[in-house]
UniProtKB/Swiss-Prot annotation:
Alphabetical list of Pfam families matching this protein: Actin
EC number(s) per entry: 3.6.4.-
Top-level taxonomic group: Eukaryota
Enzyme class per UniProt: hydrolase
GO CC, any one term: cytoplasm
UniProt subcellular location: Cytoplasm, Cytoskeleton
Species in which this protein is naturally found: Styela clava (Sea squirt)
Described function: Actins are highly conserved proteins that are involved in various types of cell motility and are ubiquitously expressed in all eukaryotic cells.
Gene from which this protein is expressed: TB12
InterPro entries: Actin, Actin/actin-like_CS, Actin_CS, ATPase_NBD
Gene3D superfamilies: 3.30.420.40, Actin, Chain A, domain 4 (3.90.640.10)
This protein's name: Actin, muscle
Key word Hydrolase present: yes
Family the UniProt entry places it in: Belongs to the actin family.
Amino acid sequence: MSDGEEDQTAIVCDNGSGLVKSGFAGDDAPRAVFPSIVGRPRHQGVMVGMGQKDSYVGDEAQSKRGILTLKYPIEHGIITNWDDMEKIWHHTMYNELRVAPEEHPTLLTEAPLNPKANREKMTQIMFETFNVPAMYVAIQAVLSLYASGRTTGIVMDAGDGVSHNVPIYEGYALPHAIARLDLAGRDLTDYLMKILTERGYSFVTTAEREIVRDIKEKLCYVALDFEQEMATAASSTSLEKSYELPDGQVITIGNERFRCPETLFQPSFIGMESAGIHETTYNSIMKCDIDIRKDLYANNVLSGGTTMYPGIADRMQKEITALAPSTMKIKIIAPPERKYSVWIGGSILASLSTFQQMWISKQEYDEAGPSIVHRKCF
């Protein structure tokens, strides 16, 4: 790619509650993936010349976590701390991608059913602080569907902060049938911390929570039949796995491996009065027009990091089959790259020639203000 072309390449930035995925439109994977964390020192710096900063972002915050207080500016998919969010965007553009934002149109993503003020403020910061020439805000689940090469289907997107079901027909999201569940990866990590404590292992601090997140990502899986799996775990050691902690201590984990993600299907495990992800998917389909349900049942697309557990697709298939009419054909699509499918969809969308007239330009923003985002982005 010549320098001339690189100038106008769009930037795609998927701001998740847990990870920021960013890169250039047309690429097949994000260039930069780092935790959505801003850390501030808990102690006063005493050594002169150490170049201590008053805040650290992403991987640097993660590596210095022992001396920092870590905060996630995005909670349940909603930006709650704008100053920190600005730091994250600044870090993305200048340190990770090393671009001048005023030269690149920028595509951002957000969770469905977010407060309107959230996307207005995103728009305002992009144009006024970063001076981008153009920008767009896309719904995460819709992008995942693009990435799977479909225009019709129901997306079950589960990330770190929020899970949602979005039925989409011929490229249109059906807002009345969107189901949002504030139960996701972070809650599962907390639950695993809790049940490991019952085994006698203690995990408390924000740093130790990150260790438990790693255990979760490496060892957890979804049981096809929970009761039967519990019986197997009780009668033999075949399901036990060991994990080495950073200090060399080895811990053994058994039924916790599948009890943790079971929460997705039984939110009552963590005291939530809510239907599991299989039921929210079914309810979402039932809120759609009777004529399009068949197409949705046949195109159940999983996306997001919390759908990466082994066994989750088979379990979804089993649970939805039990709820749906008996003659219905049900298909669960679980693409291997689904951890990043929102970003990939954004990369596809931003590089389509037909999309180029969809951008909100700086000129349009100057004329209409932040509310332009509701007119141009659905």
